[in-house]
Amino acid sequence: MKTFVAKPETVKRDWYVVDATGKTLGRLATELASRLRGKHKAEYTPHVDTGDYIIVINADKVAVTGRKETDKVYYWHTGYVGGIKQATFKEMIARRPEAVIEIAVKGMLPKGPLGRAMFRKLKVYAGSQHEHAAQQPQVLDI
């Protein structure tokens, strides 16, 4: 019996919508990363993108435990000398709530071209509206 290897052109990808209201950030991100990789499928192949498309709504209502709301700090650099910037979790939720989930999930995906392809299948929206109704996404309860 030969080992099954998924081919990129034969992979069937589904669309799912996840409501992030009240969900813990890390626990949500691990499940999203696993599904973006396709690890929940029987035909999972490490070097082939077998994951599904995932739409996350209500990203502004995601929760963190403990004092992370004020203690967790996000850093980025503008590219200019002395251009290091920082913001707490609370400030990031107010400024760009989508980025909080995107950063958490991106860190859990492989680094390189395959990981970037997997990350492109994640669509995050701050509110409850999304623009992917034509894909008829199924509700995924995490």
From Swiss-Prot:
GO cellular component: cytosolic large ribosomal subunit
Keyword Methyltransferase on entry: no
GO BP, one annotated term: translation
Single GO MF annotation: structural constituent of ribosome
Keywords: Ribonucleoprotein, Ribosomal protein
Pfam families for this protein: Ribosomal_L13 (PF00572)
InterPro entries: Ribosomal_uL13 (IPR005822), Ribosomal_uL13_bac-type (IPR005823), Ribosomal_uL13_CS (IPR023563), Ribosomal_uL13_sf (IPR036899)
Purpose: This protein is one of the early assembly proteins of the 50S ribosomal subunit, although it is not seen to bind rRNA by itself. It is important during the early stages of 50S assembly.
PANTHER family on file: LARGE RIBOSOMAL SUBUNIT PROTEIN UL13M, RIBOSOMAL PROTEIN L13
HAMAP family recorded: Ribosomal_uL13
Subunit structure comment from the entry: Part of the 50S ribosomal subunit.
NCBIfam families assigned to the protein according to its UniProt record, in alphabetical order: rplM_bact
Protein family membership: Belongs to the universal ribosomal protein uL13 family.
Protein known as: Large ribosomal subunit protein uL13
Species this protein is from: Mannheimia succiniciproducens (strain KCTC 0769BP / MBEL55E)
